[in-house]
């Protein structure tokens, strides 16, 4: 597959996403946003977009390190804060997380990672309530499709400007926006434990899976056609299973329909057609 297939006109993408943020935040009746700034590329891109769309004074970045967090993560997050001139707060999650960890075996990294992600979201939404600011998400399309994230943790937000951009496209947008190169080229990691990396967890690279997902979704190619492109059947089957199995993470809880008008099914909320005053 030609790598150019994933390339976008990032100037147009920037304009679309800035307009999206401005319009959606106004619809909710807010003027400012808060987001978790990890020192990674996804949150850096969202922070930059929000700053350009709303103004740096309307963006609050919350840095939430754990005692095992990489020093680079903190340094890179602070680098972006200084570059953009946005407001920022640091809130350690160590005490809260360690209280939970007392009952979780050290080898159960999945549960521990979920606890850390959900603890960060508790802090984020509390600051959101304190500041009367909307929580903006940072999960990219690759993560959402694969279910590589924590439900009601790092996947929780009111709006997400980058959820339709593959990880490789996030890199392209980051370069267009002038994100510091060390944030773009660093090994992708949720920083949940020392030495953890996304691609080691997944067992494949973002470049590999993005090309496969693009063929599956955007090109709507069937299995046989994709395998003809050189993709192994084992890889195809594994990724397809992940996409199907994690559909529940990409939607609100399913509601059993009883009445003639059911929230989320056939009732349109007021904010869908009028601005909240």
Swiss-Prot record:
InterPro entries cross-referenced by the UniProt entry: NAD/GMP_synthase, NAD_synthase, NH(3)-dep_NAD(+)_synth, Rossmann-like_a/b/a_fold
Any one GO cellular component localisation term in the record: cytoplasm
Annotated keywords: ATP-binding, Ligase, Magnesium, Metal-binding, NAD, Nucleotide-binding
Its EC number(s): 6.3.1.5
Binding site for Mg(2+): 42, 143
Gene Ontology BP terms: NAD biosynthetic process
Sequence positions that bind ATP: 36-43, 138, 167, 189
Bilayer-crossing regions: none
Pfam family, one: NAD_synthase
GO molecular function, one term: NAD+ synthase activity
Pathway involvement of the protein, from the record: Cofactor biosynthesis; NAD(+) biosynthesis; NAD(+) from deamido-NAD(+) (ammonia route): step 1/1
Binding site for deamido-NAD(+): 118
Reactions catalysed according to its record: deamido-NAD(+) + NH4(+) + ATP = AMP + diphosphate + NAD(+) + H(+)
Class of this enzyme: ligase
Disulphide bond pairs: none
Family the UniProt entry places it in: Belongs to the NAD synthetase family.
Function: Catalyzes the ATP-dependent amidation of deamido-NAD to form NAD. Uses ammonia as a nitrogen source.
Record note on quaternary structure: Homodimer.
Record's protein name: NH(3)-dependent NAD(+) synthetase
